[in-house]
Amino acid sequence: MLFRLLSPLSPLALTALLLFLLSPGEVSGLLLRPLPAPCLLLFLPFQILSNLLFLLFLPLFFSLPLLLSPSLPITMRFPARWRFPPWRAPSQPAAAFLF
């Protein structure tokens, strides 16, 4: 239950949550802004890309305390698919024991 509560949100869910928290006037203001100056048009793709990357990595910051907490055993912090590379997968009884 704790893992479901602390599981990271997808960037799409975070965006929807932000739009839900904004008032309708703020949302329409975001959508109906005038076009920026031509010198800023070169900067705009980089800003959009950085915003998308921020939204992509934002869930990682929510899960970092959970992943790095020493109180949880390593089998709960890191699933077996993260601990074993595919070419060195453990035998089936060992894999069943780890879960």
Swiss-Prot record:
* Alphabetical list of Pfam families matching this protein: p12I
Q: Check the record and name the InterPro entries matching this protein.
A: p12I (IPR021086)
**Topology term for the membrane:** Multi-pass membrane protein
Q: Which UniProt keywords apply?
A: Evasion of host immunity by viral interleukin-like protein, Host endoplasmic reticulum, Host Golgi apparatus, Host membrane, Host-virus interaction, Inhibition of host adaptive immune response by virus, Inhibition of host MHC class I molecule presentation by virus, Membrane, SH3-binding, Transmembrane, Transmembrane helix, Ubl conjugation, Viral immunoevasion
Molecular-function GO terms, alphabetical:
SH3 domain binding
Residues annotated as transmembrane: 12-32, 48-68
Q: Where is this motif: SH3-binding?
A: 4-11, 33-38, 70-77, 88-93
Q: Where in the cell is it found?
A: Host endoplasmic reticulum membrane; Host Golgi apparatus, Host cis-Golgi network membrane
Which Gene Ontology terms of cellular component type are present?
host cell endoplasmic reticulum membrane; host cell Golgi apparatus; membrane
Asked if the keyword Ubl conjugation belongs to this entry, the reply reads yes
From the UniProt record, give one GO term of the biological process aspect: symbiont-mediated suppression of host antigen processing and presentation of peptide antigen via MHC class I
The miscellaneous remark of the record is: HTLV-1 lineages are divided in four clades, A (Cosmopolitan), B (Central African group), C (Melanesian group) and D (New Central African group).
**What's the family?**
Belongs to the HTLV-1 accessory protein p12I family.
Q: What does this protein do?
A: p12I is a modulator of T-lymphocyte proliferation and immune function and may contribute to establish a persistent infection. Binds and down-modulates cell surface expression of interleukin-2 receptors IL2RB and IL2RG. Also down-modulates cell surface MHC-I molecules by binding to free immature MHC-I heavy chains in the ER and targeting them to the proteasome for degradation. Binding to IL2RB mediates recruitment of JAK1 and JAK3. As a result of this interaction, p12I increases DNA-binding and transcriptional activity of STAT5.
What interactions and quaternary structure are annotated?
p12I is a homodimer. Interacts with human CANX, CALR, ATP6V0C, IL2RB, IL2RG. Binds to MHC-I heavy chains HLA-A2, HLA-B7 and HLA-Cw4.
Protein name in UniProt: Accessory protein p12I
